[in-house]
From Swiss-Prot:
Its main location: cytoplasm. GO terms for cellular component: cytosol. Keywords: Cytoplasm, Ribosome biogenesis. It is found in: Cytoplasm. Pfam families: DUF150_C (PF17384), RimP_N (PF02576). This is Ribosome maturation factor RimP. The keyword Lipid biosynthesis does not apply. InterPro entries: Ribosome_maturation_RimP (IPR003728), RimP_C (IPR028998), RimP_C_sf (IPR036847), RimP_N (IPR028989), RimP_N_sf (IPR035956). Required for maturation of 30S ribosomal subunits. The keyword Cytoplasm applies. Belongs to the RimP family. It comes from Orientia tsutsugamushi (strain Ikeda). Gene3D superfamilies: Ribosome maturation factor RimP, C-terminal domain (2.30.30.180), RimP-like superfamily, N-terminal (3.30.300.70). GO terms for biological process: ribosomal small subunit assembly; translation.
Length: 160
């Protein structure tokens, strides 16, 4: 798949610059390559980060000519309600509220919202809103993302 090839191609450059490629999505019409990045040093991704990353990978993409024709390149931050793309992301966001959609239902549900309370191997434990817990195997997670909570809002705005 083209997205995977692009991600594989740009990841070494991203790592060298201190970034992690979260997602790559090439849309054919109109031709747009959207890349979502994060920083390894836990700092926020700023506009200057996106500009520097864009400039660096543009050269790599042009040399390899992996995308035929002209296209627009968009580089953006993962944002507050970011997707969790791998097990490392779940570890990084331990204690955060997330929403998960499952491949196979657990207790007749395929969608849960809860706080990541524990990770042991491939098993992720969520504290649910009804004060119960659920253990989910990482391979059973179809999609997961951070949920923007009132507590997160208070943390962001407390210095303003």
């Amino acid at each position: 798949m083209l997205n995977d090839k692009i991600k594989e191609l740009i990841t070494p450059t991203a790592k060298a610059l201190g970034y992690k490629v979260i997602n790559v999505n090439f849309v054919v019409k109109p031709a747009i390559l959207k890349i979502v990045i994060d920083r390894f040093d836990e700092k926020k991704v700023k506009v200057l980060d996106c500009q520097a990353f864009s400039k660096a990978i543009s050269a790599v993409l042009d040399v390899e000519n992996i995308i035929p024709g002209k296209y627009f390149l968009e580089v953006e931050s993962a944002g507050i309600e970011r997707s969790l793309m791998d097990l490392e992301d779940f570890i990084k966001f331990l204690g955060y509220t997330i929403q998960v959609k499952l491949v196979a239902a657990i207790n007749e549900n395929k969608k849960y919202i809860g706080v990541i309370s524990n990770i042991k191997g491939q098993e992720i434990t969520l504290n649910l809103q009804n004060d119960s817990t659920i253990a989910i195997d990482y391979d059973n997670i179809k999609v997961a993302k951070i949920v923007f909570t009132d507590e997160m809002f208070r943390q962001i705005t407390k210095n303003y």
